[in-house]
Amino acid sequence: AAAKAAGAEYCVLTTRHHDGFALWPSEYGDFSTKNYLDGRDLVGEYVEACRKNGIKVGFYYSPPDWRWNRERMSFSYGDTPPLGIDHESITLPEYTAEEQQRIDDEFNEYVRGQVTELLTRYGKIDIIWFDGRLPQKENTISADEIREYQPGILINPRGLGYGDFRTPECRFPEKTFAPEWWELCFVYSDGAWGYLNHECYKPNGWLLAELSKTRAWDGNFLPNVGPDGNGEMPHTYYQRMAEIADWMKHSGESVKGTKGGIWPERCNVPVTRNDSAWYIHIDWVCDDEITVTDVDKPKQLIYLRTGEEISFEYENRSIIFTFPENSKTILTDVVKVIW
């Protein structure tokens, strides 16, 4: 409910990460809620909560599985000698070609089985978000097969090497992917994708600035939050979501149902647009004079948070103004341009 109030249109749950633990009672493997938590289906509970709040359902799934391969892989980094799961020195086993093929086929069937469960147990699923290459790509499961189970589903490109949308991570791209669909995923807490025993989150001024830039380039923004061992979100998360919800009440129209297209070529700050207005996004650290070039003279500029009119100059087909210092907040301030 907190995410919905803050403007979330879809969520993506980590159904299984690289550690290999599946959050549903899977018939494949021995490391899921079938063997733990008395068979509780956490994925099903998530799906129910999404539908209750009118949020589209996304599943993250990691094809790589460190637990499955723990006796056959190194947990070291870079070019260092092989290390075991406890970072002890190990010698990796060697297999014949036939043995390796058997291992690969078993793992492939395991991944295929789990992905198929996710696609067939929970009704309509809107997004499948693979984090890593499927072990045998189309021979694991193809895009056509996925869509046979889930017509209309969106597939990210990390599993098959191609998909419906790009997924840059933790760094804003140097150039837009538009007209291709894309989504920027980012760590919202300060330090990790998973749960941390502190409540340090990036400020909402940062989050709204990233959202504004992403929407100005026709992308979606997917911030990550890790719950604790009981599935509870940290208190700070709810505070931040409430603050974003308040912002959405006055400025949500600037990021909902809008498109981009003119930043940075014709404006020095992000701009979103719809058929009736343009929206100029001024982030929490911007002190610059704002210039929008190659436009007709507007009727007025309105500060969405307060409704006050913003004075501006118009010359050489350019809008020029400075956002009032006494109106600035620590979030993104949005000025609506009306013609």
Roles of regions detected by a PLM:
Residues 1-339:
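Mature catalytic domains of secreted/periplasmic carbohydrate-active enzymes
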